[in-house]
Amino acid sequence: MEMDDDEAILLDDIYALASTPNQTIVTSSFPQTVSPGFLARRNEALAMVEVAVQSTILILTVVGNAAVLAMIVSLSRHKDLGRMYTMIGHLSCADLFVAIFNLLPQLLWDVTHRFRGGRVLCKLVKYVQVVAMYASAYVLMSTAVDRYTAICHPMRSHTWTSTTAHYLVIGAWVLALVFAVPQLVIFDYVEVVPGSGVYDCVDHFRPRWTLPVYITWFALAVYVIPLVVLATIYLRICVVVWKSANRKSTPMINVAARTSGATEQPSLDDASVSFNVADGGGVDLDPSGGGGSLSRHAAQLSHRQQQQQANNVVLSRAKTKTVKLTLTVVISYLVCWAPFFVSHIWSAWDPHAPFEGTEMVITLLLGSLNSCINPWIYLAFSDQLRRKVTQCCPRSWGQRPSTLSHDSTDFRSGSRPTHS
């Protein structure tokens, strides 16, 4: 079938693919390879479905994440919400960035079929689209690191504040901005076929082997490496939670056994030391009765002993709930983006990969769905956010009891301030 000029692929001057089975098109944030059959003619029915689905995802992503951010800002005016809500706010900001700078440009591009913005806008759009993808993954890793510190090293909560969490997220964004720089070189606004008058924003790789190498690097940096890091962190967290669950029947630590030379061991009513993880790993001395010598011994526990004891106490229900929330967000990210990266890596290295236009569009839509469902995950695990929604929409949502469990509502328990 002979192609029209408007539908022709970029040949000698750009792609130099006259003898290769697969050729490159751009329907996502970075290059991908598909068979020449897909390039011959745009499937208008598929394009209409893609535009409709992308529009729905875009609207839900913006509304959902903007609502979560507004609720967090409103709640923070009345009290310190702790680091977990800080990280949820950063995740929502990253998802909004994905919606505005990745989904929206892609939607407009799908509507017009050809890019209409010129050379500068072409490079800028392709750059920020990939920045959004890097940032989404790296902010997610920052959240995992924050939860790892709170659960596995509770004594660090005194120094690991919300400001520290902000710096961690800033580092994630800096990495995203740096790693996306190759997009500025790879993409350009060129005439599809010399003399045709039809321009588009396309990628150009010379030599051609750099195409699969770049796609592989992108998949490693955005998906595979974060997958390994997240799996390692949450494996460690799950081990700590599991060990804590096995000790749930002994939340108080009797320090009488540590008193050398004692012939009698006072009961917990005489003296006890309580390590409150939810309150940042502080130590509560509770002397009563005739346990004066025991109290003096407990007061002389070294910081190292305190940290060892704090790491062995039962985790609060609130912190366990934050682990469930962030783990759900991580699983959602991995599941939604897995088909996208698997199909692109496969197509990059295998000329006969079984992926055509329809399959590529579906994988792209699945990846876009991730930013859309995250706000619902936050609402599912946060009683406080749900209660805020109820207060804003009492008629449609119905009134809920105001006496909720403090630990499940605030992602923490205890009466003293905490940064976790």
Swiss-Prot record:
<feature type="transmembrane region" description="Helical; Name=4">
    <location>
        <begin position="167"/>
        <end position="187"/>
    </location>
</feature>
<feature type="topological domain" description="Cytoplasmic">
    <location>
        <begin position="146"/>
        <end position="166"/>
    </location>
</feature>
<dbReference type="GO" id="GO:0016020">
    <property type="term" value="C:membrane"/>
</dbReference>
<feature type="region of interest" description="Disordered">
    <location>
        <begin position="397"/>
        <end position="420"/>
    </location>
</feature>
<dbReference type="GO" id="GO:0007186">
    <property type="term" value="P:G protein-coupled receptor signaling pathway"/>
</dbReference>
<dbReference type="GO" id="GO:0018991">
    <property type="term" value="P:egg-laying behavior"/>
</dbReference>
<keyword id="KW-0807">Transducer</keyword>
<feature type="topological domain" description="Cytoplasmic">
    <location>
        <begin position="234"/>
        <end position="328"/>
    </location>
</feature>
<dbReference type="GO" id="GO:0032870">
    <property type="term" value="P:cellular response to hormone stimulus"/>
</dbReference>
<keyword id="KW-1015">Disulfide bond</keyword>
<keyword id="KW-0675">Receptor</keyword>
<dbReference type="InterPro" id="IPR017452">
    <property type="entry name" value="GPCR_Rhodpsn_7TM"/>
</dbReference>
<keyword id="KW-0325">Glycoprotein</keyword>
<feature type="transmembrane region" description="Helical; Name=3">
    <location>
        <begin position="125"/>
        <end position="145"/>
    </location>
</feature>
<feature type="glycosylation site" description="N-linked (GlcNAc...) asparagine">
    <location>
        <position position="22"/>
    </location>
</feature>
<feature type="transmembrane region" description="Helical; Name=5">
    <location>
        <begin position="213"/>
        <end position="233"/>
    </location>
</feature>
<feature type="transmembrane region" description="Helical; Name=7">
    <location>
        <begin position="361"/>
        <end position="381"/>
    </location>
</feature>
<keyword id="KW-0297">G-protein coupled receptor</keyword>
<keyword id="KW-1133">Transmembrane helix</keyword>
<dbReference type="GO" id="GO:0016500">
    <property type="term" value="F:protein-hormone receptor activity"/>
</dbReference>
<keyword id="KW-1003">Cell membrane</keyword>
<feature type="topological domain" description="Extracellular">
    <location>
        <begin position="350"/>
        <end position="360"/>
    </location>
</feature>
<protein>
    <recommendedName>
        <fullName>Annetocin receptor</fullName>
    </recommendedName>
</protein>
<dbReference type="GO" id="GO:0005886">
    <property type="term" value="C:plasma membrane"/>
</dbReference>
<feature type="transmembrane region" description="Helical; Name=1">
    <location>
        <begin position="55"/>
        <end position="75"/>
    </location>
</feature>
<keyword id="KW-0472">Membrane</keyword>
<feature type="topological domain" description="Extracellular">
    <location>
        <begin position="1"/>
        <end position="54"/>
    </location>
</feature>
<dbReference type="GO" id="GO:0005000">
    <property type="term" value="F:vasopressin receptor activity"/>
</dbReference>
<dbReference type="InterPro" id="IPR001817">
    <property type="entry name" value="Vasoprsn_rcpt"/>
</dbReference>
<feature type="topological domain" description="Cytoplasmic">
    <location>
        <begin position="382"/>
        <end position="420"/>
    </location>
</feature>
<dbReference type="GO" id="GO:0042277">
    <property type="term" value="F:peptide binding"/>
</dbReference>
<dbReference type="Pfam" id="PF00001">
    <property type="entry name" value="7tm_1"/>
</dbReference>
<feature type="topological domain" description="Cytoplasmic">
    <location>
        <begin position="76"/>
        <end position="83"/>
    </location>
</feature>
<feature type="disulfide bond">
    <location>
        <begin position="122"/>
        <end position="201"/>
    </location>
</feature>
<comment type="similarity">
    <text>Belongs to the G-protein coupled receptor 1 family. Vasopressin/oxytocin receptor subfamily.</text>
</comment>
<feature type="topological domain" description="Extracellular">
    <location>
        <begin position="188"/>
        <end position="212"/>
    </location>
</feature>
<feature type="topological domain" description="Extracellular">
    <location>
        <begin position="105"/>
        <end position="124"/>
    </location>
</feature>
<dbReference type="InterPro" id="IPR000276">
    <property type="entry name" value="GPCR_Rhodpsn"/>
</dbReference>
<feature type="compositionally biased region" description="Polar residues">
    <location>
        <begin position="399"/>
        <end position="420"/>
    </location>
</feature>
<comment type="function">
    <text>Receptor for annetocin. Activation by annetocin may induce egg-laying behavior through calcium-dependent signaling.</text>
</comment>
<keyword id="KW-0812">Transmembrane</keyword>
<feature type="transmembrane region" description="Helical; Name=6">
    <location>
        <begin position="329"/>
        <end position="349"/>
    </location>
</feature>
